[in-house]
Design a protein with these regions (language model features):
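Acidic, glycine/proline-rich low-complexity segments that act as flexible tails and inter-domain linkers
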Residues: 1-56, 69, 76, 108-187, ...
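Helix N-cap / loop-to-helix initiation motif
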Residues: 54, 88-91, 185, 218-222
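Short, structured motif recognition centered on aromatic/hydrophobic residues
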Residues: 57-66, 75, 95-96, 188-198, ...
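A short structural micro-motif
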Residues: 67, 85, 98-105, 198, ...
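Short conserved catalytic/interaction loops centered on acidic-Pro-aromatic/His motifs
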Residues: 76-78, 204-212
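Hydrophobic/aromatic-rich structural module bridging two neighboring secondary-structure elements via a short loop
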Residues: 78-114
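Extended hydrophobic/aromatic segments used for targeting, binding, or gating
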Residues: 209-211, 217-231, 235
């Protein structure tokens, strides 16, 4: 089996100049595997009828699942390609920053370091322009975070922060520190959260809740299935099928 012309062309757009091409070495050492992966990920999946995404959204979702699944080597390959397809440095950083709330700094730090190296190699001046809209004031962060929760999940979240210190931190830290930032809008932030949760596994209740939140703000069921489909080559079938089950459960709960 040879790599299809479409897959070759798509990889050509992904990897420019002297950037390392995904599976380039494997085409020499493991040609049968590499040919099949390239054809599947960079042709069949992308061209599946009614399952596509625009390239920029696809790469944002893929970056999020790579962080969620701790795929640092693949992240180092895909992040430059994402830049080539129009994902901005700010958007990459915002994806990484928000990941801390869902994966913890221990798992995210290697990706932040990797992104800085990639951006430095591209000549991007660091630090980037500030994106925070909330001050460091604890009350302001909580108030703005609560409003973000209400905007996304509904009015039932208005007093959620009163249910103990973890719920307070969810309001002031997870939503107040991250969701209120510029660089990504609510729909993009909920999409990447869905990707973090789907990729890491073991948090299906939260994944179902965020699938419902996505639908409430306009990322409908069909969109989420497209996200799962485009990310499947990177996270595999079990977690993709689990994510699909969560999407179906969320849809059923909203229709009840």
């Amino acid at each position: 089996m040879a790599v299809t012309s479409f897959a070759k062309g798509y990889c050509g757009k992904m990897f420019q100049d002297n950037e390392q091409a995904l599976l380039k070495d494997l085409l020499k050492t493991d040609p049968e595997f590499a040919e099949r992966f390239n054809n599947f990920a960079f042709d069949e999946v992308i061209n599946e009828p009614e399952q596509g995404l625009d390239d920029r959204t696809r790469f944002m979702a893929i970056l999020a699942v790579l962080i969620g699944s701790q795929a640092l080597d693949a992240f180092n390959e895909i992040a430059p390609a994402a830049l080539n397809f129009g994902v901005s440095a700010v958007e990459i950083k915002e994806i990484i920053y928000q990941a801390v709330a869902y994966l913890g700094m221990g798992r995210v730090l290697p990706f932040l370091n990797a992104a800085n190296k990639i951006l430095n190699a591209r000549g991007v001046k660091l630090p980037l322009e500030p994106q925070a809209t909330a001050s460091t004031d604890k009350n302001m962060r909580r108030e703005l975070g609560t409003q973000a929760q209400v905007d996304i999940f509904g009015e039932n979240m208005r007093d959620f922060w009163k249910g103990g210190h973890i719920n307070y931190w969810l309001a002031d830290n997870c939503f107040g520190d991250y969701y209120t930032r510029k660089g990504l809008d609510y729909k993009q932030r909920e999409m990447i959260t869905f990707c973090f949760l789907a990729a890491q596994g073991g948090c299906e209740p939260q994944l179902t809740a965020h699938a419902a939140a996505n639908m409430k703000i306009g990322n409908d069921k069909d969109f989420l299935i497209r996200v799962i489909s485009q990310c499947l080559p990177y996270i595999g079938y079990p977690r993709s099928l689990n994510a699909l089950t969560c999407v179906n459960k969320a849809c059923e709960s909203l229709q009840a």
